[in-house]
A protein has these predicted regions:
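Mobile, glycine- and charge-enriched loop segments
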Residues: 53-64, 172-181, 369-392
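Acidic, Mg2+-coordinating active-site environments of NTP-dependent enzymes
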Residues: 30-32, 90-99, 206-352, 379, ...
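A short acidic, helix-capping loop that chelates divalent metal ions and anchors anionic groups
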Residues: 212-218, 354, 388-392, 463
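Short, basic phosphate-binding NTP loop
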Residues: 2, 16-130, 139-150, 172, ...
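Active-site beta-alpha connecting loops in nucleotide-dependent enzymes
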Residues: 69, 338, 357-436
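ATP-dependent carboxylate/acyl-activation modules
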Residues: 131, 339-343, 460, 468-476
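Phosphate-binding loop of NTP-binding sites
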Residues: 28-31, 96, 111-245, 249-257, ...
Length: 481
């Protein structure tokens, strides 16, 4: 009942990814989604799934999803026109009377999408690794996929296909060549991770950490931990839970899980440990990876001390899959970092931009400042920081705390973007940062225009903030000719 309520109440944005699924019969689909066949050939087959008529291909099954800004039922006719062989709807009136396509009625097309993905996933004998956490999910997913890809054919979700729409669409890409699936799982409320895990059926569950991202929606860090911990509740008895030994909720989660726990951290007692962590040339880090009596040196291809912990989480997940340390090392050293995360790009004007604009939370802001501090060979270090969203009542203090943390790192100039980010400036000034070295702007366009004229050869500029404030616009302007 709780899961059903979640599906009905969730606000979604309609997204789509092209699929290469194996064909499904109409009978299979109707039974999997507990639907009613309204019309069409019951003996026909469908060869793909779509939620967007703009990318729909002939033979697809179109799900009419209702989101915050669009109702897929308005596009049912168009879907059939461009070749949909079937449609899944909750409104019978949305199906044109003259349509030859298969029409299936359900209570909730979003829920039905997940149910069909669950059924489709059950047709394959694959191992699934599920990854969640407040920060580090995407990078950890890419690291896990890089490691496991050395031994198996791996399917992973791409872009932002990590929610109740994107994860099912990713599963429809499964085919007989795949041996392992690596899935990032995002959430904005209780019940969502449980739902995603129930669909994907992971045997390895990774929780990178528990922070205060989305605390506006969940109310407390304890509720966030509960939401992340739903992943463990869906693991099988012989499953493996990968947990951060240095996280404040580690003991609670470890004690609640009855299967095998593989812990990671830089502390003694963890199962997978990073020792002798050191900053290498260019701001990248190296460390000794320890597991029981084995040790191996790892040199990270990505900037940031925090990525050592993402690497540990990925290594622990690989250990749970039976992978040896040499393969883990090779996977970590050769993975490709996700876009807009710790990308250091030199401009034609001679200054560098540290692009970390994908998103922002208090923990990731401080991690980015630490990364900026570790960069050597630059004359002036500048932090351009935007709003952090979904922090609720914690927002004022969280932003001020980032400003306070600025004093622990060698930043010469602070630029804030957005009304909330002005609190970062307040925190910095209160901690002793020079008011003359602070600039505040209302939006990213204004900040970009002003900042570019102030940069000189030898500067390095960190740009970071929540996606809604469009910090990528600043990066675009700074790197333009």
């Amino acid at each position: 009942m709780t899961e059903r309520l979640f599906a009905k109440c969730s606000q979604v944005s309609v997204v789509d990814v092209r699929t290469s699924m194996e064909k499904l019969s109409v009978q299979e689909i109707v039974e999997a989604v507990n639907g009613e066949l309204l019309g069409g050939d019951p003996d026909s087959w469908l060869t793909g799934v779509s939620t967007d008529t703009r990318s729909l291909k002939p033979g697809d099954l179109f799900f009419a999803l209702t989101g915050e800004h669009a109702d897929g039922h308005q596009y049912v006719g168009r879907a059939i026109e461009v070749g949909a062989r079937g449609v899944v709807v909750s409104k019978e009136s949305a199906v044109p009377r003259c349509a030859d396509a298969v029409a299936v009625k359900v209570d909730d097309p979003l829920w039905a999408l997940g149910e069909l993905a669950k059924y489709y996933r059950s047709k394959f004998d694959v191992s699934v690794v599920g990854i969640t956490g407040s920060v580090g999910k995407t990078t950890t997913k890419e690291m896990v996929a890089s490691i496991l890809g050395r031994n198996w054919n791996v399917l992973k979700n791409t872009a932002n296909f990590n929610n109740e729409i994107g994860l099912p669409l990713t599963l429809f890409e499964l085919n007989r060549s795949h041996e392992v699936v690596v899935l990032e799982m995002a959430m904005r409320g209780l019940g969502e991770i449980r739902r995603l895990a129930a669909i994907a059926k992971p045997s390895v569950g990774v929780i990178t950490n528990v922070g205060i991202s989305h605390i506006e929606r969940l109310g407390s860090q304890g509720s966030i931990a509960e939401a992340k911990g739903e992943l463990l509740a869906e693991l099988p008895p012989d499953g493996r839970a990968v947990l951060n030994a240095e996280d404040g909720y580690f003991r609670i989660m470890r004690n609640r899980f009855r299967g095998r726990v593989i812990s990671f951290g830089s502390c003694k007692g963890a199962d997978v440990i990073a020792a002798k962590i050191k900053c290498l040339a260019g701001g990248r880090y190296g460390f000794t990876l320890l597991m029981e009596d084995d040790a191996i040196e790892v040199k990270m291809p990505v900037l940031g001390y925090h990525n050592v912990y993402n690497a540990l989480a990925a290594a622990a997940a690989a250990v749970g899959m039976g992978v040896d340390l040499h393969t883990i090392r090779d996977g970590l050293e050769n993975f490709s970092p996700p876009a807009m995360r710790m990308e250091l790009v030199k401009s034609k004007a001679g200054y560098a931009v540290l692009n970390d604009v994908y998103n922002a939370s208090p923990a990731s802001m401080v991690a980015a400042l630490k990364t900026l501090d570790a960069l050597k060979g630059y004359k002036r270090k500048i932090a351009v920081l935007g709003n952090m969203l979904e922090l609720g009542d914690y927002a004022p203090k969280a932003h001020r705390d980032v400003g306070t943390a600025l004093m622990e790192h060698r930043v010469r100039m602070l630029v804030t973007v957005g009304p909330l980010a002005r609190r970062i400036a307040q925190g910095a000034k209160a901690a002793g940062f020079s008011e003359d070295a602070i600039q505040s702007y209302g939006d990213s366009s204004e900040a970009a225009r002003s900042l570019k004229s102030q940069l000189t050869r030898g500067d390095v500029v960190l740009v970071k903030g929540s996606r809604a404030i469009k910090m990528e616009e600043i990066v675009r302007v700074l790197l333009s000719d």
